[in-house]
Amino acid sequence: MQTTIIKWHNIVKTIAILILLSTVFSACQKNFDNQQVPNTEESANGAAAAANAKGLEQTVSTNASKEAAAIGFTETSETDFEKGPKKNIVQIAIANPHFSSLVAAVVKTGLAGALADSSAKLTVFAPNNDAFAQLPAPFNNATNITAITSAANIAFLKSVLLYHVLGTKVKANQIADGRSSVTTIKPAGTSNDNTIYFSKTYNFIRVNGNSDVIFANIKASNGVIHVINKVLIFPTKTIAEIAVADSTNFSVLVTALSKTNLVSVFTSGGNFTVFAPTKAAFAQLPAPFNNAANINGITNTTQIAALANILKYHVVPSRYFAWDLGVFKRVTTLATAPNNKITTILGYNNGWVRGDANNMYSKITPADVLATNGVIQVINKVLLPL
């Protein structure tokens, strides 16, 4: 039986050692600010290493074992799956009380038959009850889900469930290391709204940037189940639509995109990562780049061209979740070469990014805002190229 509990402590130790070995000279960094990385690369390296080692050990080692135990699966339970004839996916879910919300959702949406189909070979990323509890009512527990009568809510819930299912059997070791993606059986509504994205490092698998596989490879007669700790919600808006809808944070960014005729980049199809500066981030720049009114009033073509290049410096033509950012990884943007690379630092809780002309790292928070054409990483400083 290849059922595998993610080896959290080994992952923690491996990542911590790899990071700390590259930063021995600054490992004694004492003044780490959780909201801001120091203004030199050396101290930033030490701070990042300390943050990652501490954050991974405290967060992963403390919570992962609890999550695996909470859903009733432990290493000793592996042999239990080998006893007697295998159950189908629905039967396995029904047999475990920690999947009661999932079972209620499957029944409410009429998907029990499809997920129990003996001729199918499916992969289900199965959220446990704790994952559903993070959703707003009426999707947050079995009782509320069972009571749903709204046709719109039922249709939405059905789409969400289908977004967790692959039409083929895929074991954890068949998911490629690094970044990859796969199409689910959810019918496509808009571009990429039925695709899920994997970030895999040292057998640790994260889906869509925020949902961890906490127990993998539960064999069923008609496929395999991977247990996850957050419900996957498919994207419905483009990067531009998300920015326009959040005027509190992104009104200056939207104005800048309009002034430079770059809105089409953020509405087009494809996969982009946008490091999106907030209104407060722009306010730190000198005039006329410091607010929407001043940007809208720019007429100097040289200034408009410079602003356009700065905005392109925030766009990576590939989808990077925070977990995909390496230690001082150089990432190529859409800005004019050769000064078109930014530096990123992995953070278990988000991460940091710096432009070559910045003397401070920008904190990514919030991270991994999923869009149909990419992902948004919200940052608190504008990135500046040389």
Model segments located where?
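C-terminal motif of bacterial Sec signal peptides marking the signal peptidase cleavage site
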Residues: 23-27
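Mature, structured domains of secreted/extracytosolic soluble proteins
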Residues: 3-5, 29-386
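Sec-dependent N-terminal signal peptides
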Residues: 15-21
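Residue-level detector of alpha-helix boundary/anchor positions
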Residues: 21-22, 119
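Bacterial N-terminal signal peptides that target proteins for export
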Residues: 3-15
